[in-house]
Amino acid sequence: MEDFVRQCFNPMIVELAEKAMKEYGEDPRIETNKFAAICTHMEVSFMYSDFHFINERGESIIVESGDPNALLKHRFEIIEGRDRAMAWTVVNSICNTTGVGKPKFLPDLYDYKEDRFIEIGVTRREVHIYYLEKANKIKSEETHIHIFSFTGEEMATKADYTLDEESRARIKTRLFTIRQEMASRGLWDSFRQSERGEETIEERFEITGTMRRLADQSLPPNFSSLENFRAYVDGFEPNGYIEGKLSQMSKEVNARIEPFLKTTPRPLRLPGGPPCFQRSKFLLMDALKLSIEDPSHEGEGIPLYDAIKCMKTFFGWKEPIIVKPHEKGINSNYLLAWKQVLAEIQDIESEKKVPRTKNIKKTSQLKWALGENMAPEKVDFDDCKDVSDLKQYDSDEPEFRSLASWIQSEFNKACELTDSSWIELDEIGEDVAPIEHIASMRRNYFTAEVSHCRATEYIMKGVYINTALLNASCAAMDDFQLIPMISKCRTKEGRRKTNLYGFIIKGRSHLRNDTDVVNFVSMEFSLTDPRLEPHKWEKYCVLEIGDMLLRTSIGQVSRPMFLYVRTNGTSKIKMKWGMEMRRCLLQSLQQIESMIEAESSVKEKDMTKEFFENKSETWPIGESPKGVEEGSIGKVCRTLLAKSVFNSLYASPQLEGFSAESRKLLLIVQALRDNLEPGTFDLGGLYESIEECLINDPWVLLNASWFNSFLTHALR
């Protein structure tokens, strides 16, 4: 049969039919009768449209050959043979321009003269049986049905055959010829008997063997077979049934299922108030590094030694001054704390042997900054349960904050490439089985795309800081330990480089439970002037500590160097997750893999190489107010990685809630885009549960703003 199809039909039709079958995971070499049926249906649809035009007076005419310059418009728009996404785009466009109602299923043609969609049917059975099945499935007055059989019979809605006698005769003759050709090769009987009831290629494929047994075993109670259950589901009318079930539950429960239309959803309401502030545990785009290349000093690799070496590369230190005070803090204490760190580093250098770790003096400024002796005294409950007015202390409601532009800039920066490589090839793990050859190839391609990404720098910085802080918290519980913030990378030329971002001073850390908090003071170098976006730096006291000479296209320029100081806190569980930030690489790699898999299953071969090496192809990255943003595959990799990294850096209950609840609304919108006619109840309640997570978190507010852009463009 496969040979017959390839000989009998136009190669373009054969190619389209193969593509359609592969899109739904069916093999033309195995499902040969279905292959023949799809080719036949396509050919009839194309013949239906051939030679039919509308002239400038709006009259329908037949032109088999003639003046190529005549102002003629095709009478029929062909929808059959296009891939699903494009076909729905064409249907939507027709509906928008003509005002015709949108069909539930993809039709085959649109008739511009009669202003209606047409569903073509080709059957090996009785035409009236097939017609009833089609009509029952489509359930639409809008779509005109026209059925042809291989015996020369036809049937159409209201006996309106649309085309002239001669055009229809041409189709019937072609069908009769196909039947004769099949019969002469002994293929007709098998082809005729293989037609089952009305179905679309995506709705039915045979389940056999183990999968069939599993399907029969996993049916809900009271169903004897899979067919039985399918028939029930196909005829299921959700509205009344679900309402009936709800009415049995309680008199208070009342849910009316409302259709979810393009006009139904509204944008999420973002909170007002002062702009949101930076709340990450370390600086991101504003960080400045003091670096040494090809480190080979004594004690190289010991953080304190590396930090001292990096500090010595800078010569522009000056008397520190406060340029942006912290609103609520004692700013002079932050200034004194930095002076103390500088003094203690100089003390270390004067010692004969530099120690591996440095515990610094518990001065009054550090005790204040680290909250020493500030925790309320704990009293055993048994000692105070008789106190009459015992109550939990009042906590303030969180203050609402509005979205600020800096968080979008932070995200854009995280997606960019740096001039250093932050991970080696083996950061994601090694092969353990031969099947993983493709996995290795994907991993290597992916690593090449993201190794220089700024988000990858944030991963390595986060892993280092959290590991060092957790180690110090366990090893020196009572001490105020000085912890350098360090990262390592390779330059373009492959030279090793050690970077110092600043210092952390750890407070007392008797961490018994996962959620017990250790306080720390962070002091980070930066060239960003805090007075440009003071709202971003609400939690910081910023000092000016030096002047840095920078090489620019116009020569050397001097820029002030700042130190961003703040009190912060973390816990064992947060540090544990911070140490595992490399998981972000794995998560984004898996997302890319699922894109490759989708492409590979359509093409029936592994598309990894083409996917990464076809530099001309662009992919959707996300929604912005301008519409769908597209970029290279590298940009997609880096954007997915940056999202994963920001989910880790800005992890919070607000993010958890927003992600879980907004996903429900997203799925409903996707269902609407896929023409699945979703219904909802208590949509207001869903909006409430999403919007109660929009309080003050910058990353959540940015995601909500992206979600609104998506809603705008998805429902156009």
Curated annotation (Swiss-Prot):
<dbReference type="GO" id="GO:0039657">
    <property type="term" value="P:symbiont-mediated suppression of host gene expression"/>
</dbReference>
<dbReference type="InterPro" id="IPR038372">
    <property type="entry name" value="PA/PA-X_sf"/>
</dbReference>
<dbReference type="Pfam" id="PF00603">
    <property type="entry name" value="Flu_PA"/>
</dbReference>
<protein>
    <recommendedName>
        <fullName>Polymerase acidic protein</fullName>
        <ecNumber>3.1.-.-</ecNumber>
    </recommendedName>
</protein>
<keyword id="KW-0479">Metal-binding</keyword>
<keyword id="KW-0945">Host-virus interaction</keyword>
<keyword id="KW-1035">Host cytoplasm</keyword>
<keyword id="KW-1104">Inhibition of host RNA polymerase II by virus</keyword>
<keyword id="KW-0540">Nuclease</keyword>
<keyword id="KW-0378">Hydrolase</keyword>
<keyword id="KW-0464">Manganese</keyword>
<keyword id="KW-1262">Eukaryotic host gene expression shutoff by virus</keyword>
<feature type="binding site">
    <location>
        <position position="41"/>
    </location>
    <ligand>
        <name>Mn(2+) 1</name>
    </ligand>
</feature>
<comment type="function">
    <text>Plays an essential role in viral RNA transcription and replication by forming the heterotrimeric polymerase complex together with PB1 and PB2 subunits. The complex transcribes viral mRNAs by using a unique mechanism called cap-snatching. It consists in the hijacking and cleavage of host capped pre-mRNAs. These short capped RNAs are then used as primers for viral mRNAs. The PB2 subunit is responsible for the binding of the 5' cap of cellular pre-mRNAs which are subsequently cleaved after 10-13 nucleotides by the PA subunit that carries the endonuclease activity.</text>
</comment>
<feature type="binding site">
    <location>
        <position position="80"/>
    </location>
    <ligand>
        <name>Mn(2+) 2</name>
    </ligand>
</feature>
<dbReference type="InterPro" id="IPR037534">
    <property type="entry name" value="INFV_PA"/>
</dbReference>
<dbReference type="GO" id="GO:0075526">
    <property type="term" value="P:cap snatching"/>
</dbReference>
<comment type="subunit">
    <text>Influenza RNA polymerase is composed of three subunits: PB1, PB2 and PA. Interacts (via C-terminus) with PB1 (via N-terminus).</text>
</comment>
<feature type="binding site">
    <location>
        <position position="108"/>
    </location>
    <ligand>
        <name>Mn(2+) 1</name>
    </ligand>
</feature>
<dbReference type="GO" id="GO:0006351">
    <property type="term" value="P:DNA-templated transcription"/>
</dbReference>
<dbReference type="GO" id="GO:0003723">
    <property type="term" value="F:RNA binding"/>
</dbReference>
<feature type="binding site">
    <location>
        <position position="119"/>
    </location>
    <ligand>
        <name>Mn(2+) 1</name>
    </ligand>
</feature>
<feature type="binding site">
    <location>
        <position position="120"/>
    </location>
    <ligand>
        <name>Mn(2+) 1</name>
    </ligand>
</feature>
<comment type="similarity">
    <text>Belongs to the influenza viruses PA family.</text>
</comment>
<keyword id="KW-0255">Endonuclease</keyword>
<dbReference type="GO" id="GO:0039694">
    <property type="term" value="P:viral RNA genome replication"/>
</dbReference>
<dbReference type="GO" id="GO:0030430">
    <property type="term" value="C:host cell cytoplasm"/>
</dbReference>
<feature type="short sequence motif" description="Nuclear localization signal 1 (NLS1)">
    <location>
        <begin position="124"/>
        <end position="139"/>
    </location>
</feature>
<keyword id="KW-0597">Phosphoprotein</keyword>
<keyword id="KW-1048">Host nucleus</keyword>
<keyword id="KW-1190">Host gene expression shutoff by virus</keyword>
<dbReference type="GO" id="GO:0075523">
    <property type="term" value="P:viral translational frameshifting"/>
</dbReference>
<feature type="short sequence motif" description="Nuclear localization signal 2 (NLS2)">
    <location>
        <begin position="184"/>
        <end position="247"/>
    </location>
</feature>
<keyword id="KW-1157">Cap snatching</keyword>
<dbReference type="GO" id="GO:0039523">
    <property type="term" value="P:symbiont-mediated suppression of host mRNA transcription via inhibition of RNA polymerase II activity"/>
</dbReference>
<dbReference type="GO" id="GO:0004519">
    <property type="term" value="F:endonuclease activity"/>
</dbReference>
<feature type="binding site">
    <location>
        <position position="108"/>
    </location>
    <ligand>
        <name>Mn(2+) 2</name>
    </ligand>
</feature>
<dbReference type="InterPro" id="IPR001009">
    <property type="entry name" value="PA/PA-X"/>
</dbReference>
<dbReference type="GO" id="GO:0046872">
    <property type="term" value="F:metal ion binding"/>
</dbReference>
<keyword id="KW-1191">Eukaryotic host transcription shutoff by virus</keyword>
<dbReference type="GO" id="GO:0042025">
    <property type="term" value="C:host cell nucleus"/>
</dbReference>
